[in-house]
Amino acid sequence: MSSSAPDDTQASRLDADQISTRSSSYASDNDTDSTETRIQRNKEKQAIRLLAFISANIIALACGSIVVFSLYAPLLQSRLHYSQFQVNAVAISGSVALYLPISGVGYICDRVGLKPLALTGGILFGSGYGLAAGVYRKLDLEYRSHPEYRVDNDWSLPFLMLSFVFVGVATCCLYMAAVSSCAKNFGKGRYRGLALATPITCFGLSPMWLSQAGTRLFTETRPDGSKGDLDVFRFFLFLAALTFFMGILGTFTLRVVDEDELIDEAIEELEQSGLLDGSSLLGRTERSYGATGEETESSALLDPSKDNAKWKKNWVLNAETRSFLADRTMWPFALAFLLIVGPGEAFINNLGTIIGTLTPPEMEGWSHRTSAATHVSIFGITNTASRIFIGTLTDLLAPYPHTQHVQGPSTRSAVSSRFSISRVAFMAFFASMLSIGLLILASGLVQNHAERFWLVSGLVGAGYGAIFSLTPLMVTIIWGVENFATNYGLIGMLPAAGSTFWGLVYSATYQNGANKSKAGPEGSDRDDLFCYGEQCYAPTYWAETITVWIAVGLLLWAWKGRGGWSQRGIII
């Protein structure tokens, strides 16, 4: 008996060692499986993020079609016999619809998601351009069939305006979905400026390639076989099909990866910076833990984890929206954006008719040395180059905070001691560049010298593009990425007022000049539709130049003024 006891003890130890070995083996296997699972999940997330990035850029490359309005604006005058006021009414409808709903679109984007916006944008694009094609075709055929008497075109204006309202809202939806996906998916990286600038750049490229496609692929054929004017009907049908497909593409590919983690990080940083009181959020969580059995059972049926996550997200986003609106520096920043972008929008909308005022009617044959398509392309090239250039340059030279959330007085956002240039300085520089382009036009330097007009379209395009790239980037850096679409939407809706105001001012100036110059073709009963000379545009662009200078002053005040970003320690 005594000899068997040590044997039993030894056997027990062997069994324990084997169990321990097996447990360690199982634990090791579990750790390996867990690591492999994490790696696989990270790869899947990277693939989704990359697909969303590529899709966002493709969509942005196609959805800037509203900017090529000046390509066919002269044909609305010559073919549909619209006055300058009527042409601008159509242009203003599109511009207002592009900017005015952007705050609501941004709100939906942050709280509902990207897919509904993409689908809505695709449907509205197809409907808008389809309606515009039908209206243009019907009225054009009526004028061709009855050239001997005046056709009533009053019925067409409301329908054409409605079609461009659809196009404007669709542009807003797809643009916000594309830019927001990049802002939220790449908000942590050192090169977030480049990631955000890429879809914005593609949006700037859009009018360039679309204008060239229109003038090369969708033109009428003259009796001698040469290319004639743009075939607006076919061009509208092409845009309807292209943009509708972009909406479908975005519906299936645009996603924000790890949005829940983004919200949790935002809560933590906001509480640390003192910008947010988490007591109400904690109270909500404690109530869910202290629920009765009956409440727990009912909540389980409603999936309380999802309900709490959604409530928490909305709570944080609403708190950030209130903080954004209460920030006194936001208002001069938004007003500066309005005063800069308004003149830029009015310029591109009226580019075609401006070119027509530069050359005397008796030299009409020589006017083909420059065209609206050429300058839409020049505007597009400089617009695009400045967007991608400013995104890259600010990543390399501008200071950057080590956070993707709202910057507060206590935010720990250390910055390197390397040489840096503030993004505000870049914004002021490019706004001044835009004002120089407007000044050249206002001064009459290009009058009777249409070959010099590239200076105007190039400078305005470069300034306009840089401002549109820097503004959303500064919104993400100062006020965070999680509520980006809402915050940027509140600022982005303001240019609707600027575009409308300057469009009306230009129309009044142009029409007044037309009444004086009587520059229409001889024997025409439409002499008052066309204008030639500095009086057609100079007063408008002198005023626009001054407003851009005022905007630069507002930017500098928001940066260096009392209670400005510099005094508050905000890295920008």
Curated annotation (Swiss-Prot):
The alphabetical list of record keywords is: Glycoprotein, Membrane, Transmembrane, Transmembrane helix, Transport, Vacuole
Q: Which GO terms describe its cellular component?
A: fungal-type vacuole membrane
> Where mainly located?
membrane
**Keyword Iron tagged:** no
Q: Where is the composition biased (Polar residues)?
A: 1-29
Stored InterPro entries: MFS, MFS_trans_sf
For this chain, the family text in UniProt reads: Belongs to the major facilitator superfamily.
The record's Pfam families line, in alphabetical order, gives: MFS_1
Per the UniProt record, which residue ranges are transmembrane?
Answer: 50-70, 89-109, 116-136, 159-179, 193-213, 232-252, 335-355, 426-446, 459-479, 488-508, 539-559
According to its record, how does it sit in the membrane?
Answer: Multi-pass membrane protein
Query: What are the recorded GO MF terms, alphabetically?
Result: transmembrane transporter activity
**Disordered: annotated segments:** 1-39
The record's function comment reads: Probable transporter.
State the organism named in the record: Gibberella zeae (strain ATCC MYA-4620 / CBS 123657 / FGSC 9075 / NRRL 31084 / PH-1)
Protein name stated in the entry: Probable transporter MCH1
List locations, semicolon-separated. Vacuole membrane
